[in-house]
């Protein structure tokens, strides 16, 4: 067998498990709907007052529960049936999507209503996140977990291509309400996939003992590992200040490049790059710090370059490495958090990654929106890239 064929087979190694294929199929279709809603909601919020700050406030409302509950949710997932927790959380998220569609159809949608629903979504997502991702580790052999986690990221980011692209096509003729309704329907697929999983072929992790202090135990585990500690610190900085471009991209597209409806196209380009970042990471049976540092650099440089892109076409092209670096970094951080972690700690590690990735958004989102409205729309994305590059030297000793 050629080396190229070997690399390709190893890239998709964990898909030999039927349970994982079923689960990924449901996640893919459901997440397409999620990105339909995300794209439509961003455009809806910007259309109300033409302010990036409003999107920043919505980001705060949606992700503050992750900051508060995320680490605790990891301990909760380690102590309970992950499949069951994921089922109920996905059901609640589907109900939220139905409510959002109804209030939009009936003309009762407003910024306070959007913020309230986003807050509710945030609570369910904070609990769902470590259980949903931790469930992946129960569907494959232990040696296949890094590959499965990278493919999970590929599935989630691959849906980002179709979601925003569909939104760009459908939002004109259908409007935002129908996109919210389509998202509600999409939850049926992931709920169905959870019901179809063959429980007799699962490899459930040993539940962590009840009691103790799961959040403190998870943080202590990270702090005792110098490489993991530095990776988490850098990841938190990048997530806080360089991953919130969706807050300002609608205004950046409108003000700098004169493309009022260009946001879905930019987001689609980011998503295309994201697939390559996730698949590139899936090649590794073990994540290396050299690869991790490379992705950090790509992400930082891309943010700075996009900020001063001379036209919309160049901006779209630069969104490709932005997606590659960002999603590759997330997939790598997921892999690093799992490859040396005992089974009873895995959900806690995933929860800490989620807190760093999404829980930092309530801080970075409003800051990014404020910079875009008060200092300069270009600086709202460039500052994150600059801060990212300043922290790269922290990773050098682990290369």
Model-predicted segments: where are they?
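A single, central transmembrane helix in multi-pass transporters
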Residues: 24, 28, 36-40, 173-181, ...
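Juxtamembrane intracellular "pre-TM" segments in multi-pass secondary transporters
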Residues: 2-21, 199-233
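C-terminal transmembrane bundle of multi-pass solute transporters/carriers
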Residues: 68-72, 79, 85, 89-92, ...
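Helix-breaking motifs and short loop linkers at transmembrane-helix boundaries and internal kinks
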Residues: 49, 81, 103-104, 108, ...
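Hydrophobic/aromatic positions within or immediately flanking transmembrane alpha-helices
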Residues: 24, 55-59, 86-87, 115, ...
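Hydrophobic alpha-helical transmembrane segments
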Residues: 111-118, 122, 147-204, 245, ...
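Substrate-agnostic recognition of the 12-TM MFS/MFS-like secondary transporter fold
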Residues: 21-38, 61-75, 81-96, 113-172, ...
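Extracellular/periplasmic helix-loop-helix junction of adjacent transmembrane segments
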Residues: 36, 40-64
């Amino acid at each position: 067998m050629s080396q190229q064929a070997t690399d390709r087979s190893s890239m998709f190694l964990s898909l030999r498990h039927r349970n994982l294929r079923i689960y990924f199929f449901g996640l893919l279709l459901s997440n397409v709907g999620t990105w339909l809603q995300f794209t439509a909601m961003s455009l809806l919020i910007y259309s109300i007052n033409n302010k990036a700050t409003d999107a920043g406030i919505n980001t705060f409302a949606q992700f503050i529960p992750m900051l508060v509950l995320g680490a605790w949710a990891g301990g909760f997932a380690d102590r309970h049936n992950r499949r069951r927790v994921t089922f109920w959380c996905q059901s609640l998220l589907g109900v939220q999507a139905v409510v959002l569609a109804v209030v939009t159809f009936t003309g009762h949608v407003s910024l306070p209503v959007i913020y309230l629903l986003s807050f509710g979504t945030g609570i369910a997502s904070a609990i769902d996140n470590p259980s949903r991702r931790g469930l992946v580790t129960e569907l494959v052999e232990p040696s296949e977990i890094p590959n499965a986690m990278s493919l999970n990221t590929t599935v989630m980011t691959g849906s980002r291509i179709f979601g925003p692209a569909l939104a760009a096509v459908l939002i004109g003729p259908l409007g935002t309400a129908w996109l919210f309704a389509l998202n509600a329907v999409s939850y049926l697929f992931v709920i169905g996939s959870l019901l179809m999983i063959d429980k007799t072929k699962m490899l459930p992790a040993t539940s962590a003992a009840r009691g103790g202090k799961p959040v403190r135990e998870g943080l202590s585990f990270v702090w005792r590992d110098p490489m993991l500690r530095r990776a988490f610190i850098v990841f938190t900085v990048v997530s806080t200040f360089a991953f919130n471009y969706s807050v300002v991209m609608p205004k950046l597209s409108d003000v700098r490049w004169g493309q009022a409806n260009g946001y879905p196209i930019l987001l689609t380009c980011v998503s295309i790059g994201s697939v390559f970042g996730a698949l590139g990471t899936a090649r590794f049976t073990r994540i290396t710090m050299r690869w991790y540092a490379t992705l950090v650099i790509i992400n930082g440089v891309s943010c700075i370059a996009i900020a001063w892109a001379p036209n919309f076409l160049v901006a779209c092209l630069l969104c490709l490495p932005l997606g590659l670096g960002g999603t590759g970094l997330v997939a790598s951080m997921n892999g690093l958090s799992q490859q040396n972690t005992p089974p009873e700690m895995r959900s806690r590690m995933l929860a800490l990654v989620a807190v760093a990735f999404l829980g930092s958004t309530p801080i970075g989102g409003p800051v990014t929106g404020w910079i875009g409205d008060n200092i300069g729309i270009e600086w709202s994305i460039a500052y994150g890239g600059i801060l990212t590059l300043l922290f790269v030297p922290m990773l050098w000793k682990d290369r």
